[in-house]
Amino acid sequence: FIHPQGFINQLKFSEQPIFTAEGSDWKLRLVNNATFNAIGDNLSNIINCQNKHALEKFYVSLQEIKKSYPDAFFSIRKTLTFYYRLESKNQTKINDFISMSWNVSGLLSILIDKPVLPEELYFKFEGSDFRTPCLLSTRFEQRTIDLALKQINHRFLPINWKNINIKEVFCKWFELADRYVSLTATYQYETGFRTLHEAHADIILFATQLEAINLTMGGSKNEKYIKPINEYASPLLKQKLEQFFIKINSESLGANIATLRNELAHVDRNKKLMKALTIGDYIKIGMYLKIIVTSHLLSNLGIDKDKIEKYQNQVAPE
């Protein structure tokens, strides 16, 4: 998300925070951590160059540096990793800091579209010079862990560190995070697998959230689904949703979403759409609605519409 992993040598180790985002009672910083191998006087043994004259000049310069700074000891960087450092003025309980840490990982899970789980968590208490490790006891399904460990390609991410204002995004996210707990959980605990029951639940949840989004937009009751869809779904994503219902009836997309949601939620409704749709249809409809709700969030975080549409087109299943 931050930099292509295969090109990590392009980055210098920084002793200063790489970025800082700050609110009224919190501060979030991204910091480097690196490990080094001692190389000492053997540095010249691991350096090579096709230009022999340049290589010889390097050797001579290195010897001159050694003479000028006899106490200098060289080392080679082995690894470079990134950590978030979180501070809060008002939070005094460990659980509150853990919750804020999960908010950070939750946002990253949404932006990357895969579970992002805290690997290490340390606390530094006021007045202490030492860090204290925190052992997390949260349980995850093996499928979730496998997805979290799955490699991603920085260059193929439609939203990454370099093409958004990450400070602004974090500042807005900490204001909004509590309102999107149910959405965040679907990303953090994603398994990549759906039962029929889970597919039904996704449709009910995200259709209901579209209703709430419609209210924030000032939409009427008759447009409680179609108004958010028209606002946040790309033309391609909307077309994908429409394809499920065109083969069944001539009703509008909004009317069909309303009918399907009610058929799933109410036992007394006639199950016309439910009888016509397959489990694969249910899964995709639920995921498309989830992406539209996510796009509403991304828009509120200040991310440009063109990047949101690229995000939709990449994460939406065919």
Residue ranges: model-predicted function:
Residues 3, 16, 69, 114-117, ...:
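Intrinsic-disorder/low-complexity coil detector
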Residues 133-318:
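Amphipathic, oligomerization/interface secondary-structure segments
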